[in-house]
Amino acid sequence: SGSCSLKTCWLQLADFRKVGDALKEKYDSAAAMKLNPRGKLVQVNSRFNAPTIHDLVYIDPSPDYCVRNESTGSLGTQGRLCNKTSEGMDGCELMCCGRGYDQFKTVQTERCHCKF
């Protein structure tokens, strides 16, 4: 009589935040490329290391997400609320694209529906 061992492997996606952070990091460090006269992709700036198979590359630059662009569907960032103390994507420094921002305070009164 023989015994049979069973091995099950599970593939699971990483945490959504980790995947997003990794993609953003690759996007931020993507290499600008152009086609040479022979139709081969070459780096725009040869001072940087050549991209590997794990790096992102691009030919056309990303649109300016700070300004409204109807052809790309970007609404821009003008008029959006930002968080003055945040260093993240919702922070005023990043979201306002260096244009400055207006500050205001609001007082909001809410009924708490407390029971004693």
Swiss-Prot record:
Q: Specify the superkingdom.
A: Eukaryota
How is the protein altered post-translationally, as described in the entry? Palmitoleoylation is required for efficient binding to frizzled receptors. Depalmitoleoylation leads to Wnt signaling pathway inhibition.
User: Which GO annotations describe the biological process of this protein?
Assistant: canonical Wnt signaling pathway; cell fate commitment; neuron differentiation
Q: Which cysteines are joined by disulfide bonds?
A: 82-97
Q: What is this protein called?
A: Protein Wnt-5a
Main localisation = secreted
One GO cellular-component annotation of the UniProt record comes to: extracellular space
Q: Recite the UniProt keywords alphabetically.
A: Developmental protein, Disulfide bond, Extracellular matrix, Glycoprotein, Lipoprotein, Secreted, Wnt signaling pathway
Q: What does this protein do?
A: Ligand for members of the frizzled family of seven transmembrane receptors. Can activate or inhibit canonical Wnt signaling, depending on receptor context. Required during embryogenesis for extension of the primary anterior-posterior axis.
Lipidation, kind O-palmitoleoyl serine: residue numbers? Answer: 1
Whether Hydrolase counts among this entry's keywords is: no
A GO molecular function held by the record: cytokine activity
Matching PANTHER family: PROTEIN WNT-5A, WNT RELATED
What gene does the UniProt entry assign to this protein? WNT-5A
Gene3D superfamilies, per this entry? 3.30.2460.20
Residues modified by carbohydrate are 69, 83
